[in-house]
Amino acid sequence: MPSNLGCSGAWNLIIKSFMKAPYWIISNHDVMYEPGFLQEMNEKAQDPETGVVHGKGGGWDIFLLKDWMVQRYGLFDENLYPGYCEDMDYGMRFIHDDVKRVLSLDHGYYHGTKKDDYSDGSQTWRSEPAIAQGVHLAHEMNKRYLHMKWSEAWQSHIEGETYKTPFDLDDMPVSFTTYDLDFVRRKHLGF
């Protein structure tokens, strides 16, 4: 197994490793939960019509994904390597459908907020200019990939202006992803 699967690859590995689970809670590594947060997330997941439970504001830094969502919309696109935009890509798959989402919970969590000695985010790439440059480049390339896949309107999530299928191909299922090794290699740049 490579040393860095990337965000999508890691999330897919979680899903594939626990195939019998009714849902998966996927969280950024630097999220801290307040007491009761995960219990509330579990309670919201009991509604069979709910497809995704977000921590707050519809964000993807901590989310619960139901098994029927993966059956209908597939796994995460591993071309979005090493990270960034994989959540937006997944959201674009069901933007034209009536998927029930819980956008915020009453219990909180911390991500990107200082609390005591907590420091958010990966400190490695922030302290290493060469790694930071590679992360920035990969982020920009991932955004361009999403422009091709969903149209330039993907960033604003405007329903009527985005493609209904990947790459605007009518016969393409929304769950379509293919692993393009050359595309990923071009972005690898030391990751």
Where are these regions (language model features)?
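Conserved nucleotide-sugar donor-binding catalytic segment
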Residues: 59, 64-65, 75-80
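Conserved donor nucleotide-binding strand/loop of the catalytic core
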Residues: 1-5
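C-terminal catalytic/acceptor-binding lobe
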Residues: 91-191
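Acidic donor-binding loop at a coil-to-helix junction in glycosyltransferase catalytic cores
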Residues: 83-89
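Short beta-strand-to-loop acidic/aromatic patch adjacent to the donor-nucleotide binding site
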Residues: 21-32
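Active-site nucleotide-sugar/metal-binding loop of Leloir-type enzymes
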Residues: 12-23
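Conserved donor NDP-sugar-binding/catalytic core segment of glycosyltransferases
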Residues: 31-62, 68
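Alpha-helical elements of Rossmann-like donor-binding domains used by nucleotide-donor carbohydrate transfer enzymes
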Residues: 9, 13, 36-43, 89-93, ...
